[in-house]
Amino acid sequence: MNHYLIKDTHIVNEGKIVSGDVLIKNGIIEKVGGVINTKNNPIEVDGSNQHLLPGIIDDQVHFREPGLTHKATIYSESKAAVAGGVTSFMEMPNTSPPTFTQALLEEKYAIAKQTSLANYSFFMGTGNDNYEEVMKTNEKKNEVCGIKIFMGSSTGNLLVDNPILLDKIFANAELLIATHCEEESIIKNNLEKLIATKTNLEAADHAVIRNEEACFECSFKAIQLAHKHNTRLHILHISTQKELQLFGNIVPLKEKRITAEVCVHHLHFTANDYAILGNKIKCNPAIKAAYNKEALWQALLNDKLDIIATDHAPHTIEEKNGTYLKAHAGLPLVQHSLMLMLHYVQQGKITLEKVVEKMCHSVADCFTIKNRGYI
């Protein structure tokens, strides 16, 4: 394997930007900083007037393989990922069939080994009747990024709504539990009310149906369970101002037992955008009123929110163009997340160092990933 020497670049790492060289041997960073001289005749890369970032780690993607490959594959989406600077991903279990057994989990790893262009890990899926299979994942702490629980329904019908089972999983899981938190009873009630009063639902109704209260109540429930059992809990795609009161920033990330993720679309869009984009920005949890977006930004900058991710969820254009109730939920974002955050760096909303912290360092720390997320 070739050796590379990146010369005179701006290295963005651990809260600082420093100028220097970086030596890479056999795919591994060997030396960082200063002027590096080597006798191995490496391939030199001129890094002057450029910034060198760690590869982005996205802890929430849906790459659709197996079973939904008319939408995407591990190969196609990992290709999009690396094109956008995402060099590691963690993929969700709502494929077809869902990743409910160890055999199906291993199948994903086998596919990725052959086709992925990026580093990878996969979440084990939970349902209402696969507890024994889920617990077998405890033996794979160094391979599997975590256990995913849909505490609210979304693409794939993986809803876990048995309170006794939820308590049991939180009590006995030795891996990180990642949750999709939207209270199903509130969603159903809101939908029924709207159907009773409106002839045709539209995209903007999504934020009313999957409202702030649905998110808060379910996140609160997950945190109660985590406190009860001292579970390592990671709540995905926080989308509301109200949920932020559930999270703290007193202790460093590495000491937190409960962490929170925010997604780029909740930092970028608001409910006002439904008027133009319609179902194209339909996603779960919903994009909501603008004050939520501003609160999310504040919480990201003050470290109540720990990680920036995408929840990358591709569909065909036909699947997105249906009526509101038929249109699929999800946005394709993995190729665009870094570029979007760099846009906000240019706007002065966030520093480049903070982007690297939230998209690289913190993800590696949250999931205890070695040799990734830092330079």
What are these model-predicted stretches?
Residues 110-126:
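A glycine-rich helix N-cap at a beta->alpha junction
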Residues 132-308:
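Histidine/acidic residue-rich metal-binding segments in metalloenzymes
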Residues 9, 22, 27, 49, ...:
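Divalent metal-coordination and catalytic microenvironments
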Residues 1-39, 50:
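N-terminal metal-binding scaffold of metallo-dependent hydrolase/deaminase domains
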Residues 203-221, 225-230, 301-308, 313-375:
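His/Asp/Glu-enriched, well-ordered alpha-helical/loop segment
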Residues 86-88, 118, 145, 306:
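Short acidic/polar active-site loop segments enriched in Thr and Asp
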Residues 50-115:
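Metal-associated gating/positioning segment near the N- to mid-region
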Residues 90-91, 121-124, 232-237:
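Short catalytic-loop micro-motif centered on adjacent basic/acidic residues
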